[in-house]
Amino acid sequence: MRTIAFLITTLNLMPMKTGEYNGYVAVPPEHPLYGKGDSAEEVEALDVHGGVTYTGKIKHLPYPSELLDHKEIPRDWWVFGFDTCHYGDNPERWNLERCTEETRELQKQLEELFAQSE
């Protein structure tokens, strides 16, 4: 894998009931979506819960709660993320397992775009 998936817990960030985690995938500067914002057509086309709600560098996020790929994330990589803070989201529905699955699906889409660009 040339991307890195990770989760950040929402338990200390949100005073209301939401999912337990938000999911993120970091991509290197060579990725075709590197630097694109969440309103870019290619980013809006990504199929993830609630759409992509974060794009930016890792330095603007809290430290990951769960590094799914057991790697350090380079500071210059670009991050795409989704949150579990939508109406109807809750800790039972968006627990660690479910958020991990959704994050892996986002990672798979970003990996496929990387492969197509080569």
Residue spans of the language-model regions?
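Acidic interaction surfaces
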Residues: 1-118
